[in-house]
Structure formats: C-alpha cells, structure tokens
Amino acid sequence: MFTMKKSLLLLFFLGMISLSLCEQERGADEDEGEVEEQIKRSIWEGIKNAGKGFLVSILDKVRCKVAGGCNP
C-alpha cells in the first residue's frame, strides 16, 4: 500500500511539472502573438497615416485649382 501511494504521488508530481511547463510554453507563445500583433498594428498605422497625408495634399491641390488662387 505504501509503495502504491509513493508511485501515485510521484505520478502526480510529474504530471504537475509537465503541466506547468506546458503553461509556460503557452505563455511564451501568447507573448510572441502579442508582439506580432503590435508590429502589424504599427505597420498599418504607418500606412494609414501616409495615405492620409497623401490624400490631404492631393485634395488641397485640387481645391486650389478649382478655387483659383493658391498660395505656394
């Protein structure tokens, strides 16, 4: 009976160790996903800001030509 308890206790601890290692690895994977998401978000923000600037400058030029007099 005593050896059976020892082996069950050993299996329990080994299972807990493997479970904690899996949780640590999963946490590392989630961190990588967050970094990738932040990179994608920053790239899209840059593209969006560049597009806004380009469109504003084009619209200013069109408005200037339609209205007539423009200040250089």
Swiss-Prot record:
GO biological process assignments: defense response to bacterium; hemolysis in another organism
Protein name: Brevinin-2GHc
Disulfide topology: 64-70
One Gene Ontology cellular component annotation held by this UniProt entry: extracellular region
Signal peptide feature range: 1-22
Gene that this sequence comes from: br2GHc
Similarity section: Belongs to the frog skin active peptide (FSAP) family. Brevinin subfamily.
Purpose: Antimicrobial peptide. Active against the Gram-positive bacteria S.aureus FDA209P (MIC=9.8 ug/ml) and B.subtilis ATCC 6633 (MIC>64 ug/ml), and the Gram-negative bacteria E.coli O111 (MIC=19.6 ug/ml) and E.coli ATCC 25922 (MIC=9.8 ug/ml). Not active against the fungus C.albicans.
Main location: secreted
Tissue occurrence: Expressed by the skin glands.
Organism: Sylvirana guentheri
Key words, A-Z: Amphibian defense peptide, Antibiotic, Antimicrobial, Disulfide bond, Secreted, Signal
Prosegment residue ranges: 23-42
Superkingdom of source: Eukaryota
Cellular localization per UniProt: Secreted
